[in-house]
Amino acid sequence: MVRTALLVRTMMRLLAMVFRMDILAGRSADEGSQEGTLARAACMYAETYDTHKVPYHQCYCTYFHGHTSHINTQMYEKHSKMKEICSTFVNHASYFAGHNIINGLKSIIMKEFVKMTLATLAGLLIFGIVAFFFSFAMIGAMAALGEKQVVMPREAVLKIDMSSFTLSEQSVEANPMDAILAGGSTITPIGIYDAINAINAAAADPAVKFIYMKPDGASGGTAQIEEFRKALSNFRKSGKAIVSYTESPGNASYYLASVSDKIFMTPHDGATNMFTGLSSQLIFIKDLLDKLGVNVQLIRHGKYKSAGEMFIRNSSSKENMEQNVEMVESLWNTWASEIAQSRGITTEQLNGMLNNLELNFPTDWVENGLVDELLNYNQLEQKLCDLFVAEKFEDVKGISLTDYATLKNTVNFKAKKKVAVIYATGDIVDGDAKDNVAGNRFAKIISDVRKDSTVQAVVLRVNSPGGSVLASEKIKAELDLLREYKPVIASYGDYAASGGYWISANCDKIYSNASTLTGSIGVFSMIPDVGGAVKDKLHVTITPVNSNEHGDMYGLMRPLTPKEVDYMQASVENIYDKFTRLVSEGRGMPVERVDEIAQGRVWTGADALTIGLVDEIGTLEDAINYAALSIDGVSGVQDVQVVGYPKPQTTVEALLESITGESNVFAGTAFEGIGEAFGEFGKHDIGKAYARMPYVITVR
């Protein structure tokens, strides 16, 4: 950086000097003859050459009419380079005649300039090379720190600490930067399919004696939690036990713990009971926008299409409240029925405990049959010793789920045939972005999968609330083409709504979790009018100048005219008609029936099964198994390679993202939902049509 600045300064000074000498060369003979010009030029150069800016020398030039000149060198001997240059001027005065003075000076200057430039560039090049290799060495060292050698004991307990990882759609490599910043402890994302495979492997592994689970702090989507619990339930069928220990149970954590053979709880008071039932919070910010002088104009089709409602109302519409109540009740019925069945009680009894707040103290949990025994940690260790058949707790060897998954989730490279799993996770957006479901990028991925002859079946894993209609159309077009060559099976995660349903409605078979949120077959467009805020709050007046009558239609400085509203409404209606027709074709039902269950309404997977929007309640594992069996000559998933697209981040990519990534300043605060609400403005291009489910839905 210092060398670069020095180079720039030197170039500027040399250019300025040459410019001044050009002027000097054009003076009249009265002001400077050939010899006089030489002396003056040499003097100028001496004065300019002091790169150290230290006035330790002076050069006095005297002009003699007798065609002689000399340089009075007073104190300049201290500067050897200047002495050399000035001597050159005096000894070769005949050469520097007229304009040749300038050429000679330029030649000398350029030699010095070139030498300095080359030296500087060489230094920069060497520095760049060293920095490049040093950076990669550091990244490699940090990546190595993030890796550890996993060793499987001869006999072990599979330890599942739900607070140490989060269930995600795809596994990603551990980011060592996170570990460094967090002081050595991080929450690792583990893909749901990898987690399920690990549990399945443990069921058949004679080295794994039982599962010890700490369910508190469980994180993941509702569908991911549901799939994980099903895998635990299947583990029990192997005859091996699951024991859980909880201190502060919540909805998701107790839902997981309830599958256990035994549930132990701390006897100590003071822990907060978060097991109170599910809740969906709807946020409305119209009053806030009114105070800011912002008016949002919403054009939509579907009485249940509540996306954007938060901007135009201060409370929920009747239809939106209806669908949210039914959605939360359906989700809770799924969880409550499984909890009740596992604990040998009725759902009515369970709901009564929660409604009457009967689970206040640890003893209440035992009395109501939700916990088997209260144990302090020493007593818990003895229980684990008894199950492991060990004399002391130090002999109870364990391996974490994430480490065990690393050992067991290996690719079957011997298999020549592949099942591709395309993970459509996040908002559906236009362009080629690496995050979310970018239309151009995913169309390219699907096209590549179609052209890969080793891929003989495809699972489309959808975990998206929808988004851009244009991007959805691009993705669906490629999927339709893919279906002409290979079977495409859909698997729904937490969301497969609106645009998420658009891209998957024509799949050969659709699996959905009971807690999946799907449907939301509707369309909307949204235009904010910020003219009032600009004029009244910022005191800025904007006057449009248009070539045509509606040139400023999307200028945001005025409300739409009735004619413009009709124009946009016609576009929304046209897209809605296309949406219902493609659902009719994909699901084999009349358009009129599709319209009845559409209207933008959100359905849970359990309800979607009854109305024909999905084919079967099942997990990602079920969809992959079905896809494998659809391949000729394949008897099961063990005979194929399962490959995921897009490829997950590498350690290096995760490190770079850590350095350049963004953070949510509202995360974990009461304002997080409001921050997300304002963030919705940035997700929509003005005037575009979107197929997206209602915005901020938080289920706890």
Predicted regions and their residues:
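Short hydrophobic helices that act as membrane-entry/anchoring signals
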Residues: 103, 107, 111-126, 672, ...
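Short, Lys/Arg-enriched N-terminal segments with co-localized hydrophobic residues
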Residues: 72-109
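Cleft-lining beta-strand/loop regions that shape enzyme active-site pockets
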Residues: 149-151, 156-283, 411-533
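Extracytoplasmic and endomembrane cell-envelope/extracellular-matrix remodeling and assembly machinery
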Residues: 380-421, 475
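Intrinsic disorder and flexible/low-complexity segments
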Residues: 414-419, 423-454, 645-700
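Polybasic, low-complexity intrinsically disordered segments
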Residues: 3-9, 13-65
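N-terminal type II signal-anchor transmembrane helix
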Residues: 111-151, 155
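Charged, glycine-interspersed solvent-exposed loop segments at helix/strand-loop junctions
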Residues: 286-385, 531-611, 615-631, 635-637
